[in-house]
Design a protein with these regions (language model features):
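N-terminal Rossmann-like NAD(P)+-binding domain of SDR-like oxidoreductases, especially those catalyzing
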Residues: 1-175, 217, 223, 292, ...
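Acidic beta-to-alpha connecting loop that harbors the catalytic carboxylate
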Residues: 10, 117, 179, 207, ...
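C-terminal substrate-binding subdomain of Rossmann-fold SDR/epimerase-dehydratase oxidoreductases
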Residues: 17, 55, 99, 174, ...
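Short, surface-exposed alpha-helical segments at coil->helix boundaries
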Residues: 39-42, 153, 189, 246, ...
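Short, solvent-exposed loop/turn segments at secondary-structure boundaries
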Residues: 84-85, 179-184
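Short, conserved glycine- and acidic-residue-centered signature motifs
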Residues: 93, 148, 184-185, 275
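A glycine/serine/threonine-rich, flexible loop-to-helix segment
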Residues: 126-127, 182-190
Length: 312
């Protein structure tokens, strides 16, 4: 039985990953300090092969038993969180990644860094391949997250090149699904919360900016495929289907049956105008392709908000 350590395992993505690994017969050690996550995401797990450890990864990580995989997902990924705790965001990206890599080195485990499409910033190349270096403002408000991930990637490559650690890097594009916090600060949970409360849906800017939304089940499947490969260069994982934020808002209204209106507010500083993954590398290396389209994913997500989708 393989043993996997998942840092940030009580968060949105991390908890889905824990579920998937347990279903595949892994022993899972979940490490989280619960600052931005919740044990509610794990309370359904009743498995002797699951262990939860309340620990901050900015402190050294110690695991007594054998470890085969280290999935480093600890991060302040929500704008609400990294804008409120900018220094902690940078520390998790630096100290936290260093400690997770140190664990993988000591245990001779395969390491997978959860990086992000935010390393591309406000891209001037579209769609974004892994070879694109990005267009990022390091001193803007988003820099505390973007640069934390860019540094984490550099640190991961340094451990691979100098220390021989078996590492992988996944650049995750906008992902959604059950267990997202309703006040997460990201478009999909914001729109669903507003629609179900019959409040106006807040679109920033004119809504023409685009994103590509990947359902969490598709993403997690790709994560494990990448972890089980020997690829050490970054790999994009995301759904290449591209939607404007205004299209997203209208789709949420359709799925929820809400009569809410759409209102427009000023675009935040450094908000990217476009975001779409080039997943050629994932297709070629992993034979991975997302399967769940946006409207279907939103319908699957709604019951977690206590509401059934309309028009089913």
């Amino acid at each position: 039985m393989p043993t996997s350590v998942v840092t940030g395992g009580a968060g949105f993505l991390g908890s889905h990953l824990c579920d998937y690994l347990l279903a595949r017969g892994h022993r899972v050690i979940c490490i989280d300090n619960l600052v931005t996550s919740s044990l509610t995401n794990l309370e359904h797990i009743d498995d002797d092969d699951f262990v939860f450890v309340n620990h901050d990864v900015t402190d050294p990580i110690e695991v007594a038993e054998r470890v085969d995989f280290v999935y480093h997902f600890a991060a302040l990924a929500s704008p609400v969180d990294y804008l409120r705790m900018p220094l902690h965001s940078l520390k998790v990206g630096s100290y936290g990644t260093h400690h997770a890599l140190g664990l993988a080195k000591f245990k001779r485990a395969r390491f997978l860094l959860a990086s992000t499409s935010e390393v591309y910033g406000d891209p001037q190349v579209h769609p974004q391949p892994e070879t694109y270096w990005g267009h990022v403002n390091p001193v803007g408000p988003r820099g505390v997250y973007d640069e934390a991930k860019r540094y984490a990637e550099a640190l991961t490559m340094a451990y691979h090149n100098q220390q021989g650690v078996n590492t992988g890097i996944v650049r995750i594009f906008n992902t959604y699904g059950p267990k997202m916090r309703s006040h997460d600060g990201r478009a999909i949970p914001n729109f669903i919360r507003q629609a179900l409360a019959n409040e106006p849906l807040t679109v920033y800017g004119d809504g023409s900016q685009t994103r590509s939304f990947c359902y969490v089940d598709d993403l997690v499947r790709g994560l494990v495929l990448l972890a089980e490969s020997d690829e050490h260069l970054p790999v994009n994982l995301g759904n290449p289907g591209e939607f404007s934020i205004l299209e997203l808002a209208r789709t949420v209204l359709k799925v929820t049956g809400s009569k809410s209106e759409i209102v427009f507010e000023a675009l935040p500083v450094d908000d990217p105008q476009v975001r779409q993954p080039d997943i050629t590398r994932a297709r070629q290396l992993l034979d991975w392709e997302p399967e769940i389209e946006l409207e279907e994913g939103l319908r699957r997500m709604l019951p977690s908000y206590g509401r059934e989708p309309v028009g089913v």
